[in-house]
Amino acid sequence: MKDLKRYHVLFVLLLSVNVLSTTPVKAQQTIQFSQYVFNGLAVNPAYAGYKEDLTVNLSFRSQWVGIDGAPRTGTASIDGLTKNPDKKVGLGLIATTDRLGPQNTSSVYANYAYRLRLDAEDTKRLSFGIAFGATQYNLDGSKFIATDPGDGTIPVGNQSKLSPDVRFGIYYYTPKFYIGASAVDLLTTGRDTVTSDSYRIIKQVRHIYLTGGVMIPLSESFDLKPTFMIKEDFKGPTNVDLNAYLLINKVVWVGASYRTGVKFWDKTNLQRGLDQNDAISGILEVFINPRFRIGYSYDYTTSKLSNYQQGSHEVSVSFSLQGKRERVLSPRYF
């Protein structure tokens, strides 16, 4: 009975993230991070070079702790400027791996950003970015529990598919404000991908991100930074992240986030009565020094999955490798 309940919970998990349907097996759509505001390259290629110094970001997320097969995600990125004295070109590389039940996904993207200077003080820039990469999808058929041993829709052995992708983004920033938009999975057809063994395992859809934030000085020691992210795939509920951070002496960041699905317009293919609740998060970031940051976040799930798991944990580290380039004129808070 215990094993039956465990597999039932895993089945609910897979359904909730669109991994399984009644006929084909589908891939998880876009990876979730609570600390995306500290690594904009994960959602927008135009972010490459924003901090100007060569910057490395590492993060790991363990989602829905307590559920067998729940998502485990790691990412590593590096970005910076070329030696062009006008600081017009930013380059970046990001690699991500994600495991969810029988599915494993790995991707690598090379990012290029062209940065237009908009004022004499060089505090305002408009950046256009593009990324080229590929994603390797793997599905382990041995991890499925079949009620009918002769079910031909269950994959046999390991199924895999390599898919190229293009991303595009635009990013505008000042010392006190930023806004960005990006589109990912631009090469997808929206159709199921068929492997050599005729198993349909992947159905990626295009996603659009809109992000923004402001820096509000409260006193000499405190600043408030509210941010948002809207994620749209034109199929499921529109996903909205609302965040607020209190900066203490520019060293400690204490924040909270609320993530939910919203209905901006009527989507005819959207399941009626779908639970759009997602999570609330507590976030702590500490700058050990101006070039080294460490962060932790905890997500409390507000959906029906809350009865089956103990939340999600995410840790991140970033550090800057400052070379001979002149120091950045204004701090990079985004």
Locate each region found by the language model.
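Short intrinsically disordered, low-complexity coil segments enriched in acidic
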Residues: 1-2, 16, 121
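Sec/Tat signal peptide C-region and signal peptidase I cleavage site
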Residues: 23-27
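Bacterial N-terminal signal peptides that target proteins for export
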Residues: 1-11
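A detector of low-complexity, intrinsically disordered, Ser/Thr/Gly/Pro/Ala-rich segments
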Residues: 20-21, 209
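Subset of outer-membrane beta-barrel
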Residues: 28-334
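Bacterial N-terminal signal peptides
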Residues: 11-19
